[in-house]
Amino acid sequence: LAILATELLKQFVRSNMGEIASVNNVDIWWEDYGEKSNTTVLLIMGANASALYWDRTFIDELVANDLHVVIFDNRDVGKSSWFNSEPLLVKLAKFLPHAVSKKLVSSAFKSMVDDDGNFAMPDGKGAKYDLNDMAKDAICLMDHLGIEQAHIVGASMGGMITQIIGLDYPERALSLTPIMSSPGVGDA
């Protein structure tokens, strides 16, 4: 029980860290690890997934290898700006330990894209942005943090965003690593 309580406390503290950057007309929650003077790895999580889903052991290993790591919540996720009404479960999840909030958020969403490439939102209305806007969010966050170039790593939809960064902002990427991703939405 003591081990569980300690782990829940660690997750709670971690979920209440980070900062908000106002970039690209949205508020983006972000957090970083390691020395800012080291080469940066920007980790981009997938659809409806908080940046806190990145495994802390993975982040610690990157930092141990002299890298600076930046994670952030995409739009309509976690503590970043919401364009439609934020689901009650997500509001609640912001105040709960990460292990509990992860389960709530996962059950609150179904990752869907409509025929126009817009993200389907819980209220049934399509979002007024696309993956290109989300790639620009990442680049604007890098600008905000004074990061010229970074290794860009994205999981799932984050991998699609990573690929767009490579196409639209190649001078900003030291390398691109899409994980569990595809080349895009629609016909391949």
Where on the chain are the PLM-derived regions?
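Conserved HGGG/HGGXW glycine-rich cap/lid loop of the alpha/beta-hydrolase fold
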Residues: 26-120
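Catalytic nucleophile-loop/oxyanion-hole region of alpha/beta-hydrolase
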Residues: 87-91, 123-135
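Low-complexity, intrinsically disordered Ser/Thr/Pro- and acidic-rich segments
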Residues: 1-4
